[in-house]
Amino acid sequence: MQIILLDKVVNLGNLGEIVKVKDGYARNFLIPSGRARRATEANKAEFEAKRAELEKAAAAKLAEAQAQGEKLGGTTVKLTQKAGVDGRLFGSVTNHDIAEELNKQGYKIAKSQVRLPSGPIKTVGDSTVSVALHTDVVVEVTVSVYGETA
């Protein structure tokens, strides 16, 4: 299916590009989430009429993400979990825990924006995680996990 992208989509294309994707991906994800429209002649004409407005909105989102990224960059998140004597946690620290703590600190972060490179954190100590604020803005955050004896 040919679609017009209304937003930048990772590994697919930028705003305004006409790309061919599988029907299910377009029908079940891209079109319902508002990231794309079918590439019919009517939709192409409508997109060209709104192109400047959509580009302005995309630039505003990017600027907002960059501003938040500058504030968030280098932040340290401190979490306390129950741990054994050897430094292994009973349970783990997930992206949900990190996003929750960042929200308590005043940042508006969804758990899907937190990227744990090697899965959940299962040991006491410092780890570096990525927070994807925008497709073009990825910030590194340090997570310090402290052990709490049971």
From Swiss-Prot:
The answer to whether UniProt assigns keyword Transferase to this entry is no
Q: Which GO terms describe its molecular function?
A: rRNA binding; structural constituent of ribosome
Q: Which GO cellular component terms are attached?
A: ribonucleoprotein complex; ribosome
Is the keyword rRNA-binding in the record?
A: yes
User: Keyword annotations for this protein?
Assistant: Ribonucleoprotein, Ribosomal protein, RNA-binding, rRNA-binding
Q: Which Gene3D superfamilies match?
A: Ribosomal protein L9, C-terminal domain, Ribosomal protein L9, N-terminal domain
In terms of NCBIfam families, this protein maps to:
L9
Q: Which family does it belong to?
A: Belongs to the bacterial ribosomal protein bL9 family.
Q: What is this protein called?
A: Large ribosomal subunit protein bL9
Protein source organism: Paracidovorax citrulli (strain AAC00-1) (Acidovorax citrulli)
Source gene? Answer: rplI
